[in-house]
């Protein structure tokens, strides 16, 4: 009786709610499909306790908090941003299977969310009726120290992953990003990089198995899915092909002592000299050394920061930098020795907290827009100076430019080994970011566009590359033109994936020919023509 009562209450929502009437779509057909979907899902779950934990309708008190909890870009929390008709929070893998099977049967559009860090909000926003599949409850992490491997569910964050590794062993690590609240689901499936990329490459380079739910609702591991499918989800964006439930990753060794450091400059002349020289050094120096460049405003001044990680002692670091990069002016007082897991906290700017600070899930308070580029030839000082002046503009109060060095392991892995193609020949990647508070966004977004335009002659061309994990809808998206999605998707797909785009399309055509898993920039199948 309890289950039937709960099911009746949620079904009544779908048959009577005026919320759905405000969404422009064929109302009667979609409402019928949504009710049928809910009935299908509720019957498959078949337990009132599970149903109440998994299904959240707009009438539920939990709906708003669940929706908002993983919105990491406040640009997509405004009242006029489309909201889902339903949020599902699976508590076990079979719940995901049920959701996919029922959604496919009744034509329900699903968006899958892990940590909510999609830069354009595509894991939780679209302009047609949709359901969010939020994987927050699938976050178990099993560390096998003896075999140097981990099974991690995709609702976990990289901070939680780092914490579990650090608890077990201080000389094992994983080469993923620096922001601890990023979900491992999207991060690994887009490539994923951090301070260890020059020594060990991308996170995706160390994925050795995966469990997914495919478009037919089957749970598959690497052996069952095949090597092409497995290749595609390690850098090609998993949400185009399946729902990734968990990853098996291989851990890497790090020294018991590493060194972090930071050098800051406020003088434009001093900063430009160092940045210009950095371009000739950062990708060629020992792969034990990672030095990032960050440009941003600080108390109405432009500040250049050079934070870095060295896999070794301060003594050896200073010896190397004084020889290879004396322009940096690195001194012993700029450096601190610590364990690798402590360096993760340092780069995340979390202070001197215990390592369990990495498990905290915080919600971003600012809106932002971002773009990315890859640089293959050193920029002249005039170009760097132009960036400095852009940061002095009023709209750049919270802007940030991040230069991430490549080389090392990144140059040793062929560009076709995973879908991420930006390997050998790239000196560094630039990320252009601008943050703001409030609803007035146009001037801040235009600032990013101006900077991006300024850099056009100094970055990779044919195509001008971009990183899928720094998603940018300005590159293009499906707009409903009556031509093949392949022709539309290729225009931006080659920017993210270069020659690997064609192989991704072949995989998509094989594993999801009806395009069940899709979004505004998803990989298209060859066979599918539709108005989105």
UniProtKB/Swiss-Prot annotation:
Question: Keywords on this record?
Answer: Cell wall, Disulfide bond, FAD, Flavoprotein, Glycoprotein, Nucleotide-binding, Oxidoreductase, Secreted, Signal
Residue stretches making up the FAD-binding PCMH-type domain: 80-254
Q: Signal sequence span per UniProt? A: 1-29
Cofactor note as given: Binds 1 FAD per subunit in a bicovalent manner.
Crosslinked positions (6-(S-cysteinyl)-8alpha-(pros-histidyl)-FAD (His-Cys)): 117-179
Q: Where in the cell is it found?
A: Secreted, Cell wall
SUPFAM superfamilies, from UniProt?
FAD-binding/transporter-associated domain-like
Q: What GO cellular component term, any one, is given?
A: extracellular region
Q: What class of enzyme is it?
A: oxidoreductase
Q: Which domain of life is it from?
A: Eukaryota
Q: How is it modified after translation?
A: The FAD cofactor is bound via a bicovalent 6-S-cysteinyl, 8alpha-N1-histidyl FAD linkage.
**Residues linked to a glycan:** 30, 33, 46, 59, 147, 169, 262
| Main subcellular localisation | secreted
Cross-referenced PROSITE patterns: FAD_PCMH (PS51387), OX2_COVAL_FAD (PS00862)
What does the record give as cofactor? Answer: FAD
**EC number, as in UniProt:** 1.1.1.-
Q: Which family does it belong to?
A: Belongs to the oxygen-dependent FAD-linked oxidoreductase family.
Spell out the protein name for this chain: Berberine bridge enzyme-like 18
**Lineage per the UniProt record:** Eukaryota, Viridiplantae, Streptophyta, Embryophyta, Tracheophyta
